[in-house]
Design a protein with these regions (language model features):
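Acidic, metal/ion-coordinating pockets
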Residues: 1-377
Length: 377
């Protein structure tokens, strides 16, 4: 748990959530202990190519940076807001394994000695339910789990069998007060069924479909496990990488998790850009948080989605009821493979897009000079 001087813990709990944290490939190459750079992509055969692309776009990078470097201005924001709990979707394996997943071309890995890139932001929980956690096989997943465990960072959605993978990360915030993080890797995000954990095989907490029956089953299971005083985050890696559309099945699935009493926050990710926000029955639904850290700098083809922009989400929940009390989001830009405060045009773009995409849910967004964007409902 991270200390905070915010409202008393018995009254409110503030969280930090963000989208995909992709610290492998190009970012790993500038950290103190870069892993083997070999890639198997059609256009790039070395992770160093992504460093060169970033330099071509925005100037020379240091040959080596410290592990905190990629977080840049985000660290000051975290110090300012002081959330009780910090949760990210870590979309890279932490391993030196060379046993890449067969027939998979786009692979992410970070050297285990660079785990400080995660711990420097004092992250409490890494969600591993995504389509890169097994890029380097089950050996790579085991290395990731072991490295994070030794760093004192909890994980959700992955384990050495299905029971372990289904277990929530339990984050204590005060006596009798916990935040539980359940996480699911949906087939719709490109996670293959073979990555599912089984009674005899390690893997992910796999979500085969977004049916009403599946949502009810998951929701009732979580509702039965939560105790009085618990707050529950349900993390879903779902949908494609590009496009603002929110499917009817995603909408209904999120609602069902809340209707069953399972989720206080539905924390969605996979899209490389922000998507709409809904407040349903006083519960927060983030349909797509966008990327937080990536090495896409200098890559062309998706500029209309502004993959260089990121949001730091800071929801505040009523500790007694789980209801959303307030939500702010701080705009960032990825430049020189690190987070910096978004320039005025970037902040305006995020404001306009969030307002446009959230309006259908009765959610509205306003800009504030102090801490970025405020969400209203």
């Amino acid at each position: 748990m991270n200390e905070t001087d915010d409202a008393p813990l018995h009254a409110r709990v503030r969280l930090f959530l963000c989208g995909d944290v992709m610290t492998g490939r190009g970012i790993d190459q500038i950290l103190p202990h870069p892993g083997a750079p070999r890639l198997y992509e059609r256009y790039c055969r070395s992770a160093r190519d992504y460093v060169r692309l970033a330099e071509r776009a925005n100037g020379e990078l240091p040959a080596r940076v410290d592990c905190a470097y990629p977080w840049g201005d985000a660290l000051a924001e975290l110090d300012r807001v002081r959330p009780h709990v910090r949760i990210v979707n870590l979309e890279t394996a932490i391993t030196t394994s060379d046993a890449r997943w067969p027939d998979k071309a786009v692979l992410y890995r970070m050297h285990p000695r660079n785990v400080g890139c995660v711990s420097s932001a004092r992250i409490d929980c890494c969600v591993l339910a995504n389509n890169h956690s097994l890029d380097w096989g089950r050996e790579g997943l085991a290395d990731t789990l072991d490295t994070l465990r030794r760093a004192g960072i909890r994980t959700a959605s992955a384990g050495d069998d299905d029971a372990h993978a289904a277990r929530p990360a339990t984050l204590g915030v005060a006596p009798g007060r916990r935040v539980l993080v359940y996480a699911y890797a949906a087939e719709t995000s490109g996670v293959p069924p073979s990555w599912a954990a089984t009674p005899r095989r390690g893997g992910l907490n796999y979500l085969a479909d977004l049916s009403s029956g599946r949502a009810t089953q998951i929701g009732e299971r979580i509702a039965a496990q939560r105790r009085e005083g618990d707050l529950v985050v349900v993390s879903l890696h779902w949908g494609g990488n590009w496009g603002f559309e929110i499917g009817d099945d995603e909408h209904a699935f999120a609602h069902r998790l809340i209707d069953t009493g399972a989720a206080d926050i539905v924390y969605g990710h996979s899209s490389h850009h922000v998507k709409g926000i809904e407040i349903y029955r006083e519960r927060l639904i983030l349909y797509g948080c966008g990327d937080c850290l990536n090495d896409y700098e200098g890559i062309h083809g998706h500029q209309p989605f502004r993959p260089d922009l990121a949001l730091m989400y800071f929801p505040v929940l009523d500790a007694g009821s789980g209801a959303l009390v307030e939500l702010s989001a701080v705009p960032m830009q990825i430049r020189n493979l690190r987070l910096q405060r978004a320039p005025a045009d970037g902040k305006a773009w995020l404001h306009a897009v969030l307002e446009r995409e959230s309006r259908r849910f009765g959610t509205h967004v306003s800009a504030c000079d102090v801490d970025g964007l405020h969400v209203h409902w």
